């Protein structure tokens, strides 16, 4: 007696839909142009870009969205009008938190964490200003080389509490490392 064995593929084809890298839709608009680099899966947005994703909003004059890394990068624009330098900086808002104005931001859509350079945001009756800031997924922010002031001039405050490092829980408290008062 002979046995016949057929080669059969026992694995079945996966019919489940592949999960998108996003949990929701990114919507946006811009004043000038939008360029999509298909090879690198990166979108470049120029001039007054405005991106919304879930409860996050980011506005800036230049933005780069990397689909593979789930990263949005934004920076401001320096311009000269009538010989006076004009700066338009990105603004970032998440949920009901106060907006952040900054020089640059690198925001991870997946983890909801961000690295921010040159940030200013209103906290209580004053302003928190930081050179190097990390925003965590629970909206706490870690500031290195920070300032807290009630002076209206956030670019160059006349007086401030200088903080070598700080942790901010928005709407609740600010915990600092070594801090000292500066009067100019």
Language model regions located:
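Short, small-residue-biased leader/transition segments that mark boundaries at the very start
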Residues: 1-5
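Structural signature for solvent-exposed beta-strand/loop edge elements and short helix-capping sites
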Residues: 6-184
